[in-house]
Amino acid sequence: MIETEMTPRPPAIFIMGPTASGKTALAIALRERLPVELISVDSALIYRGMDIGTAKPSAEELAQAPHRLIDIRDPAEAYSAADFRADALKEMAAITAAGRIPLLVGGTMLYFKALLEGLSPLPPADPAVRERIEQQAAEQGWDVLHRQLQEIDPVAALRIHPNDPQRLSRALEVFFISGKTLTELTKISGESLPYHVHQFAIAPTSRELIHQRIELRYHQMLAAGFETEARALFARGDLHTDLPSIRCVGYRQMWSYLSGEISYDEMVYRGICATRQLAKRQMTWLRGWDSVHWLDSEKPGEALDSVIQVVSA
């Protein structure tokens, strides 16, 4: 249908923010006040059996305010931004058809971007090219391939760490297949989101507050049984650190501890540091985000009222 003044786009709400910023609490409170249904936008919460280390909403919270797109994949399975976009659009359409408003809440900014702007026309994976890249990595090391990427696509090389073989391999694969860099292709936007989106970002006013919350929550997760949860995953035998699930913050560090590579104290230290780095990346995304209303997570009542006021205007 062609959009005209007679066919306005239906509303949707984004609640974005760094880890440990109170996004879930705000979303649940909004569900008490607005006709919304919640959709999770989190690349870790999709995995079953990864509850404590991902700070997944509790059973009580999920009973009070069900979240769609939680527990939809086994940790051994992959899940891409394209998968998320397809799933989210389907859930949003169902919510809208039921006369309610989709409220998308989470911190995976790449998913929000894919949903808003569509997906870039990247070539599909080529097993032969991927095998050639992995063979070179086995012979020369990923550092050599990262230097190669620096020459081909310096912008992507700045974003991709040498210790992230999946993303590094994909960036090289895209160039070898298409002759164009990942940076060039990601500038080409796909289909935009057919909704009128109210976008909100919730965060503490200072970095120190984020750091304090992260450290407190990490220790709370450990006290709640994070190590036991990780040991159960480790014992499966089919999971490893090349999988997106086990590369999630906290699980990667726990894996190193369970493998005997680092001590318990070092695991805790690295886990907290990695979570802080994640929050920093999330804040960097958000500071460059267009058309976003900022909310102070230290004033949840005001944040709730602000969202309701904007959405109801």
From Swiss-Prot:
One GO BP on record is: tRNA modification
Q: Which SUPFAM superfamilies does the annotation name?
A: P-loop containing nucleoside triphosphate hydrolases
Q: Where on this chain does ATP bind? A: G17, P18, T19, A20, S21, G22, K23, T24
Q: What class of enzyme is it?
A: transferase
Q: Name one GO molecular function term.
A: ATP binding
Give the keywords, sorted. Answer: ATP-binding, Magnesium, Nucleotide-binding, Transferase, tRNA processing
Question: Positions of the site: Interaction with substrate tRNA?
Answer: T108, R130
The reaction(s) catalysed by this protein are: adenosine(37) in tRNA + dimethylallyl diphosphate = N(6)-dimethylallyladenosine(37) in tRNA + diphosphate
Annotated spans, Interaction with substrate tRNA:
42-45, 166-170, 247-252
* InterPro entries in the cross-refs: Dimethylallyltransferase, IPT, P-loop_NTPase
Q: Where does substrate bind?
A: T19, A20, S21, G22, K23, T24
Give the quaternary structure: Monomer.
Q: What does this protein do?
A: Catalyzes the transfer of a dimethylallyl group onto the adenine at position 37 in tRNAs that read codons beginning with uridine, leading to the formation of N6-(dimethylallyl)adenosine (i(6)A).
Q: By what name is this protein known?
A: tRNA dimethylallyltransferase
Q: Which organism is it from?
A: Serratia proteamaculans (strain 568)
Q: What is the lineage of its organism?
A: Bacteria, Pseudomonadati, Pseudomonadota, Gammaproteobacteria, Enterobacterales
